[in-house]
Amino acid sequence: MSDWIWALIIGFVLDLLLGDPSWLYHPVCIIGKYIGWMEKKLRRRGGNLRKSAVFLTASTVLLTMAVVALILMLCGLLGRLPLLIAMALLDWMGIAITSMAKEARGVEKALGQGVAAGRTQVARIVGRDTQDLSEEEIIKATVETVSENTTDGVISPLLYAAIGGPILLWGFKAASTLDSMVGYLDEKYRDIGWSSARLDDVLNYIPARLTALLMVIASYLIGLDGKNAFRIVRRDHANHKSPNCAWSESAAAGALHIQLGGTHNYFGKPVEKPTIGDADRPAERADIRRANRLLYASSLLMMVLIVLIAIVR
């Protein structure tokens, strides 16, 4: 196997063991600062924001990839081992399994203290308004976020790291960060964020569908309803404005026999969304743990798939 696959294995294990340590200043924060600074600069300059959007997207992704390439080149000058360590660390910081699971567990724990505490905690990981959410709505929001993050935070990074090492992984992370900061359809971001949103859709197109397949298989392996997960994916995979989000959400909804999606408030305004899955039963706190199990199992399946392909090659 190539060194970058070994580095990916090491990075994957580090994420499982350590997550994102609180003392580590995450590279995504640096990317976010650049995006915020450049967005303000482009807005002040005026002109056609749709053209500026392309520059914002391209400069963020290419600059990120260039910095990672420079780091790897410098480490490579020191020898194979320093390069392997650098790649492993960059892969580790680009994967978000344990940190997402930890946030989800935090919501479940907060709900034990009451709905108000649950609302405060879930606000850390969702974009919708949370001040009026019921306990069941908090649980559903958490399950949705975990299932979406299985694509954005795990399967996509692993796929791009396997194809192009840390350079391609961090190109994807830059695009994902752009989408989370400016890739909205509201009046403020419609022009400056359109290219970031489209790039994120393109980059997640294959990983989203792969994630759904992995989640269906994982459902069988961990005792959830894989057959129903597959049925709901086939039926509801298009029930979202995004071409990608409903794939993993429908797999989770089917595996858990709960209904996700529906209308929610964002910035005080209701946003109508189709439902995903069937309301076979009310969502319960244990569904957060089940969603985390799906996250871990799907991630492990993806890593095994990458290693097997690397061995065969």
Task: List each language-model region with its residue ranges.
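Hydrophobic alpha-helical transmembrane segments
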Residues: M1-A175, G183-R313
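Glycine-rich phosphate/dinucleotide-binding loop and adjoining beta-alpha-beta core of small-molecule
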Residues: S180
